Amino acid sequence: LIAHETSHMWFGDFVTMEWFNDVWTKEVFANYYASQIIEPLFPEVNHSLNFMLDYIPAAYSEDRTAGANPVKQQLENMRDAGLMYGNIIYDKSPVILEMLIKKMGKESFQKGIREYLKTYAYGNATWEGLIGILDKYTNDDLAAWSRVWVNEKGMPEICGVISAVSYTHLR
């Protein structure tokens, strides 16, 4: 809880979302960095496994329901802002951020986050603004990736086709 709330000093206070459509951005960083900040204190713990067990089952469980929402939701007026908070934000968004970091590489991601914090210091930012900055540090199309994982509900379906089969037996 302390690590989560401390993360809000940077993601939520130092850089604040432009509108509640992006409220999830401050929560994703708070959840993610809260899970990461304790790693050096407990090197004997399998933090990757704990992260996976804490977030992935809950994210899949929430995201496969008929009433699932995308992580990024549109908000027409402030009176409904409280409806933006929910399991999809607290459970799925850390999984999305972890995927983004793995896609980019930790070093590239950290460079992008530093630029993001510097660019939007004491101001307002959007998710698209962050993706625009992070895009400079990778060859991947992060905008396309974001459309699928952030703006759509549910988990993307992956289909595969086997075109050739071979078998090798080694002794």
Whereabouts are the PLM-identified features?
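Hydrophobic alpha-helical and helix-loop surface patches within well-folded domains
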Residues: 1-171
